[in-house]
Structures are given as C-alpha cells and as structure tokens.
Amino acid sequence: MAKGSANNVKVNQDAGKSQPEKKENKDFQYIVRIANKDLNGERLLPLALSDLKGIGERLGYVIAERLDLPIDKKIGELKEEQLEKLREYVEAKEYDLPEWLLNHRREPVTGKNLNLVSTDLEIQVQEDINLMKKIRSYKGIRHEKGKKVRGQRTRSNGRKGLSIGVVRKKE
C-alpha cells in the first residue's frame, strides 16, 4: 500500500450511528390555510397561529386552550374537524376572551371589543387613520405630515430625504 493512498480513502463516519426514523403520517398536512393565509403545518399549534397578523403567541395559546386543542401538537397533525373548528373561531371577530387580550377594543361605531385578523386588521387600521385625518385630530395631522405620532423626539431622529452633511466655509 502506498503512502498517499490511505489519505484518499473516505471513511463513512456515520455508518455506525443509527438515525431515528421519521414516522410518516398520511393525514399530515404540510400547509394549513386559515384566514386566507397558508400556515406551516410543521409548527406547533400556538406558534403557527402567531403567524397570522393580529394573533400573537399568547393569544395562540389561549385559543388552543379554549378550543381544547393540544398545544404540543403540530398544526398539520390536527384532524379536519379540529381545523374547521379552529378556522371558525379565528375568523369570528368577537371572542369570549378578556378585553386586554383583544386588539381592537371599544370599536367606535358599535362599541364592541373585537379581535381582527389578517386583512380585516389592516383595513380597520387604515380606516382609523383616515378618521383621525378627517376630524383633524392631532394624531391625524401628524399622520398627514408624515411626522412621528406617538410623542417621540424629532430633533435628531426620523429625518427623511437627502443627507447634506456639514458645509465648510470657503477660505
């Protein structure tokens, strides 16, 4: 055997190790559609729900507990009846949850506490901003001018446009 030939031989180091076999489930869904959004079926139920705009991780856990769904299961492992129950609950705007957990409290027209999801939330936020502009509130005027709305300082941050820099005097 030549000296250099031992270096050219590749040894399979993983050959002795046993790899755990993945259990294939025929009912597993890799993509679950809820509220017009595709959710990754390989994520745990509360975490997958938090991918929806308007539902955070905490609300995802609360929804799973309210519907008696297992929080340690992946969303793709749920049965079709469970998924349908979940879809109906998420897409309903009124939840039987504490007020502090909802994202649209005391709606101006009806006075109800709602939790909006996905495009409903985006549309409602835009309508609220337009209402503030229409009634000429302080926040509405700040929105119109493109300035900071929530009381942040504007002296040094939030500048838009070209940066000019310091101009030196000509000598």
Curated annotation (Swiss-Prot):
Lineage of origin: Archaea, Methanobacteriati, Thermoplasmatota, Thermoplasmata, Thermoplasmatales
Ranges for region Disordered: 1-24, 144-164
UniProt biased composition (Polar residues): 1-11
Species this chain originates from: Thermoplasma acidophilum (strain ATCC 25905 / DSM 1728 / JCM 9062 / NBRC 15155 / AMRC-C165)
The keyword Magnesium belongs to this UniProt entry's keyword annotation: no
HAMAP family, per the entry: Ribosomal_uS13 (MF_01315)
Keyword rRNA-binding: yes
Function, in words: Located at the top of the head of the 30S subunit, it contacts several helices of the 16S rRNA. In the 70S ribosome it contacts the 23S rRNA (bridge B1a) and protein L5 of the 50S subunit (bridge B1b), connecting the 2 subunits; these bridges are implicated in subunit movement.
GO MF annotation list: rRNA binding; structural constituent of ribosome
Top-rank taxon, per record: Archaea
Subunit structure, as described in the record: Part of the 30S ribosomal subunit. Forms a loose heterodimer with protein S19. Forms two bridges to the 50S subunit in the 70S ribosome.
Pfam families recorded: Ribosomal_S13
Protein name: Small ribosomal subunit protein uS13
Sequence ranges of Basic residues compositional bias: 144-158
SUPFAM superfamilies: S13-like H2TH domain (SSF46946)
Xref: InterPro entries: Rbsml_uS13_C (IPR027437), Ribosomal_uS13 (IPR001892), Ribosomal_uS13-like_H2TH (IPR010979), Ribosomal_uS13_archaeal (IPR019977), Ribosomal_uS13_CS (IPR018269)
Family from the record: Belongs to the universal ribosomal protein uS13 family.
UniProt keyword annotations, A-Z: Ribonucleoprotein, Ribosomal protein, RNA-binding, rRNA-binding
Cross-referenced PROSITE patterns: RIBOSOMAL_S13_1, RIBOSOMAL_S13_2
GO CC, any one term: cytosol
Gene: rps13
GO BP, sorted A to Z: translation
